[in-house]
Amino acid sequence: MSKTITLTQGKRENRGAGPCALPPGRVGGSREAAGSPAGAGSYGFLARRASSSQPDGFSLGRFAGGRPALLLAILLALLVGGCGAPAAGSKLEMAPAPTPAPVPPRPVVLPADEAAHDNLSEWWYYTGHLRTESGEKYGFELVFFQGVRGQNPVGYAAHFAITDHQQGSFSYEEKVDRTLRVQGEGQYRLAVGDWTMGGQGDDHYLRAQGKGYAVDLKLHATKPPVLHNGAGWLSFGPAGDSYYYSRTRMEVGGVLQANGVSERVTGLAWMDHQWGDFILVNGGGWDWYSVQLGDGTEVMVTLLRDQPGNVAAVYGSYVDRQGRVTELKAGDLEVGATGSWRSPHSGATYPSGWKLRLPGQGIELTLEPVLRDQELNTTRSTGVSYWEGEVQVSGTRGGASLSGEGYVELTGYAR
């Protein structure tokens, strides 16, 4: 039975963060599918990049949304030479009740803001779904993180993962580097080791290679960027503030190499870019869902959980065929897990399989992982283990059949 978000509290396992340093280089993992049967175990809701459920802005208080709260905090501490993780049970001061956010310091300006900034924390995140000319299917994730700390060198980390439908396997790599960023007017070009990404306006490119897999992709956005919280600016109270936008539908073309064989691929991708002067907020985690439906619409849902396991914030966006955005509040959506999966690598138990319902849009969806095991154990670069996996989507809109693809990110279950 699916459990909805209403005041649901779940379990999270705290585990060691692993080594606190890694010289420039790469480590990775590759595993065959070893999924366990879905169970109806308890499910703790988390959230990732929380934005406002109030159209005029808000403050999340001590619950800095999503990656700023946990992943980036640990990462950035690592990149400047310390372990930086908070002691168990440590607390931050509670911020005032949510209030309308002040006017942003400046508006998001694109394409100029595609490039790197001098803020404390920043990342560029891509996931996508690829199909070869012979009909084979693959999912991919490529994400670059940047940390800026005063006079310290700029620090970078990156993750690259491939979900191979044919082999039933999931492979990932991680890197850290202090490569100087390279960028030009109105564009960005970044490198972490020999992995690169960049873009200008609606056109982007990605290049990465790992053990057994490589991608050389060009992406073109077919819809305007989604500026979250209306203006693309979020307040996290005492934890700082952040700019955040997404490109929810990008057409992909290029070459994928799998086990020494190169093939042309096409597909769809999703891009997130977030930056700001946000820093550590202790505990909790997030679940983030991105769905690209076959009718040309997209759905994003974020659930944020505090350290005790309570739902601290809920946010969503629905993007129609023309790129018009409807902000979704907690009362506008229902999401819950249909099963669970226990990782043989970290020992964490993750939700596995979901029901997502948007009553206002008449949408009811089922999300099923392509593979149960899509966990990244990135303790040597970002200090955490997390589940970032490709999902297959089916459902209905007003009774008519729907299908699509998506990605789900789960953090806070294992650290």
Where are these regions (language model features)?
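Structured soluble/peripheral alpha/beta segments that form catalytic or ligand/cofactor-binding pockets
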Residues: 4, 84-415
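Short, low-complexity, intrinsically disordered N-terminal modules
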Residues: 4-8, 26-27, 49
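Intrinsically disordered, low-complexity repeat segments enriched in small/polar residues
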Residues: 5-17, 77
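Short, low-complexity intrinsically disordered segments enriched in A/P/G/S/L with frequent Arg
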Residues: 11, 17-23, 35-41, 46, ...
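Low-complexity intrinsically disordered segments
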Residues: 1-5, 11, 71, 96
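C-terminal motif of bacterial Sec signal peptides marking the signal peptidase cleavage site
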Residues: 80-82
